[in-house]
Amino acid sequence: RFLSNICKATWPVLFFFFALSNPVFSQSLVINEIMTSNSNSIKDEDNSYQDWIELYNSGPTSVNLLGFGLSDDPLVLYKWTFPNVSLASGQYLIVWASDKNKTLVGGQLHTNFKISSTGETILLTNTSGVTISTVPPVNLQTDISYGKYPNGTGPYAYFGTPTPNAANLSAGFSEILNPPVFSQASGFLTSGFSLTLSSPDPGTTILYTLDGSEPDENNLSGTTYNYKNQYPKLPGQAFGPFLYNSFQTLQYTAPIPVADRSSQPNKLSAMSTTYDFTPPYFPNGPIYKGNIIRAKVIKPGALPSKVVSKNYFITPSGSNKYSLPVLSLS
């Protein structure tokens, strides 16, 4: 009778503990990283790039997610619910925000909604109705993620190198910068002009190049390299001399003059691309040239902007110079 009374007294306590155990341990679950405009990070099982949400379990115990809700609407916390899957301690789980609504246990999980790249609140809610992790609305550029740093515990930050299904090991950025604004669109123009660059973000610096290279804050002094245009093709032929060229990043401080560069010496068109000792395709004189201007915005503690490239061709005949469409790759 004594043991029976103990069992009767203990059973409700044990039942109460186990009933609460999963919600308690679920507090270690976080939305660790998200991407709302995916064009090049990871693909789903259908070989397509989709938005994704990464969960991370920082606790000591596996958590069963059955009945947990994911939503982009604070008024509908269980917009999409998890099937009977568990997330082990220290593990990550990718849920695709693709609107494909897949909940097959053992397969990849897909929500029944997508996430706007301009920003939506994302919520993870446990079976007790408690929202245990919330990502605030944030405007994300393509292939930029937003996640916790330090991993799993810190505030949210921007990442230029996303880490789906892995820890956020590199320090994130507190701000993401908008691309620079050019005062003139690319194209053919009949006369030169002064190009102005601007940034919509305060306290920033604009870097640009005129040689087609990527703007780089570590190349403000320029980089010189050497190359050769001649190599022996036949016995007795000598190696050609070393030639030199350079590329450099500039800091924008004043309008950039854009003019017809056709009278300047040939550079790229004068570089050999074959093993011919005397290439027959070198131009006999200066050729028609365009202006390639590439720029980006930087700021301490902020994720640099995407590089913007513009091409300008100055000629009296304007766009009528060629009868065929012109495609510029830079």
Where are each of the predicted segments found?
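Bacterial N-terminal signal peptides that target proteins for export
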Residues: R1-W11, N22
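First exposed extracellular module after export/assembly in secreted or surface-exposed proteins
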Residues: F2, E45-D46, P200, N284
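Intrinsically disordered, low-complexity peptide-like regions
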Residues: L3-S4, L20, V30, T36, ...
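C-terminal segment of classical bacterial N-terminal signal peptides
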Residues: F16-F25
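Activation on beta-sandwich/Ig-like modules and their edge loops
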Residues: F25-P155
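Short, compositionally stereotyped local motifs that mark structural "simplifiers"
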Residues: V30, V85-S89, V95, V138-S330
